[in-house]
Every structure is written in C-alpha cells, then in structure tokens.
Amino acid sequence: MIRIISFNINGLRARPHQLEALKEKYDPDIIALQEIKVSDEDFPPNIPEDLGFNYYNYGQKGFHGVAIFSKEIPTNTIKGLNGGEDENQKRYIQCDFSTNHGLVSICNSYFPQGENRKHPDKFPYKDRYYKRITNHIDNLNNSIVLTGDFNICLLYTSPSPRDLD
C-alpha cells in the first residue's frame, strides 16, 4: 500500500513544522504540496531531505507552485502541461513510479480559483485549465492518482469558511 498526502501548504518555508507533524503522524510515502511559493532556484532542499524524502518541485517566488516529496525515486518527472498559458504559474507536476502493479503517475496540481462563473477572465481560464489537465490525464496509458487543491466546492450553496463559527 502507498500512503499519499495532498496538502496546500501556503508557503513551504513558513511551515516545515507542519510537514514534520504529518510525517510523524501518518508516515506517508508521498506528499503532494500546493502553493509552495518558492522558486526552483531558492527551493530549500533541507526541508524534504531532513524528512527522508526525495523532492521534485516546480515553483516561483511568492505564489503558486507545486512539489512532490517521495521516498522512492520516480522513473520520470513532468513539470507543467506542455507549454500552455498556465506554465508561468507553475501549477502542475507529475512523478511516474514503477510499482508491482505497473506504472503509476502521481499528478499534482494547484487548480485556478476562478473567482465566480461570471468573471470574464478568471473563470474561463479555470475552465480551460480543467480541460487541459483532463486531456493530459486522458492521454496517460497507466494508472494515476490525481492530487491537489482543486479550488472547487461540492455545492454552490456551500458556506464560505468566513461564514462559519
């Protein structure tokens, strides 16, 4: 069994203690992170290495960015969705692992927020992104695990966290 955790960390360098707590409590094989908010050049390798993980990151300074920490070394890593309009936002990373059951792709994404259905730019961008990632996944010829911050709610009437006590 593979134990996978997906976590919007909202700033990797600010929350290594949360990763330590996740590792201690759940002992995951893979941690998929969103909103790492650190460029590839400034990525702190000590954070995953101190936890016993290999790391694969695709980020930029200050916002967005994704990473996969894994105990095993993947056979392949893909950063981005092949040159689309989202590439400057660093929203997708994929690591492929060879297992006893064949190749498994861990696909990790920080999906666009979209604002609301009537927003003239953000919602159409979100719709295009979902179509692109769906097309990408449909073209994979192996098992997948899709992780990430999907930026969706189950029901349109779901309350905002600000409205909850």
Describe every region a protein language model picked out.
Residues 1-49, 53-54, 63-66:
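N-terminal, active-site-proximal structural segment of metallo-dependent hydrolase catalytic domains
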Residues 2-11, 103-116, 147:
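Active-site-proximal beta-strand elements of phosphoester/diester hydrolases
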Residues 7, 34, 147-149, 164:
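Active-site flanking residues adjacent to catalytic metal/cofactor-binding acidic residues
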Residues 36-114, 118:
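Structured beta-strand-rich core segments of catalytic domains in phosphoester-bond hydrolases
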Residues 102-103, 141-143:
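Short coil/turn segments at beta-strand junctions that form active-site/ligand-binding loops
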Residues 123-142:
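A long, amphipathic alpha-helix that forms part
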Residues 142-155:
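Acidic/histidine-rich, metal-coordinating catalytic segments
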Residues 156-165:
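Single conserved hydrophobic/aromatic residue that forms the stacking wall/gate
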